[in-house]
Design a protein with these regions (language model features):
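Sec/Tat signal peptide C-region and signal peptidase I cleavage site
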Residues: 14-20
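Bacterial N-terminal signal peptides that target proteins for export
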Residues: 1-6
């Protein structure tokens, strides 16, 4: 009995690195699912890379409605999964509750901040990457208008839109940017038919380039721009391959890297709670330049984008953050 107690005590005293082999990651995706070709899929890509490198399986759950988020987080924690990653700002309230119930379980949330000693929060400077998308879009549109289709009408998506407008106006101060949000509920992330309708409406009003930040809804946006012979801008994951020759670029939000890094840190024993903010300087956001859009981006256009990125990194250009004051003064 004494030997058993000593063994238990020694295991409890082990540093995190010594217990790293027990890591059992799990993911609760946002509405839209892990194959949305956008935000969720980026997270899934990072998880797959982690599994390939480590041999450790990552469990996951794809909610079909809002109420399932908290249930799934709690189920994974009860099952001993650790860390448990919550995808999307809409999971913040559920995670706040569950993290308190399981103080010894490590949690990660992407796109929101949950202030708890066992939660790592990863957020991005979407306005910076969107600014670059606006620069490139304005150059490609020449004297035409730009379009923006968001998913759910929330401050985070307004942040994308505001950065996009600011970047576009740095190239053409008089440019008009048409904007629509798909809806006000979680269903707005998974309505490609409505996304296509909104994009076609903007194109009919003169949009030559349409940027979407709309989850699976964005698939419909990009199909509509392609069908109309216009240019689309993808988001989160590299969506250039969806319609080669019709995708101007994609505004990459490296949720794949954030996911893989969080799981690897848990495995290595270096995981820490707190807030990580990833922008251009941290390679957390960027534009995609690849074979699929090489014919659409001239050296002059790319140089203008690179110069803008350098100016943002150095602080010479300040990109307004909609979420700082709930306004877009552009």
């Amino acid at each position: 009995m004494r030997a058993t107690l000593l063994l238990a005590a020694s295991l409890l005293a082990l540093p995190p690195a010594a217990r790293a082999a027990d890591v059992k990651p799990a993911i609760v995706f946002d509405l839209g699912g892990k194959f949305d070709k956008s935000f969720n899929q980026g997270v899934n890509d990072g998880a797959l890379r982690f599994t390939k490198a480590s041999g450790i399986e990552v469990r996951d759950f794809e909610p079909q409605n809002d109420s399932q988020r908290e249930q799934a987080l709690r189920k994974f924690a009860k099952a001993g999964n650790d860390p448990v990653l919550a995808v999307g700002f809409a999971q913040a309230t559920a995670l706040e509750t569950v993290a308190k119930e399981f103080p010894k379980t490590r949690f990660v949330i992407i796109d929101s901040v949950v202030d708890a000693p066992n939660v790592q929060s990863v957020v991005f400077r979407e306005e910076q990457g969107s600014y670059l998308a606006g620069v490139l879009g304005a150059m490609a549109a020449k004297d035409g208008k730009l379009g923006f289709v968001g998913g759910m009408d929330v401050p985070l998506i307004r942040r994308f839109a505001c950065g996009y407008v600011q970047g576009a106006k740095s190239v053409r101060p008089d440019i008009e940017v048409l904007q629509n949000m798909t809806g006000t509920t979680g269903a707005a992330w998974n309505d490609p038919v409505r996304g296509g309708e909104l994009a076609r409406s903007q194109i009919e009003r003169g949009a030559a380039v349409v940027f979407q930040a709309a989850g699976a809804t964005g698939v419909g946006v990009l199909q509509a721009t392609t069908d109309a012979g216009k240019l689309g801008i993808g988001v989160d994951s590299n969506q250039d391959q969806l319609h080669p020759g019709h995708m101007l670029t994609s505004m990459l939000k490296r949720v794949d890297v954030a996911t893989e890094t969080a799981f690897q840190a848990a495995k290595d024993g270096t995981w820490k709670p707190g807030v990580s903010t990833l922008g251009l300087a941290e390679n957390g956001v960027a534009l995609a330049f690849d074979d699929e859009n090489a014919s659409l981006v001239t050296p002059e256009m790319k140089a203008r984008v690179m110069a803008a990125a350098d100016a943002i990194k150095s602080g010479k250009v300040k990109v307004h953050d909609y979420m700082a004051d709930q306004s877009c003064p552009m």
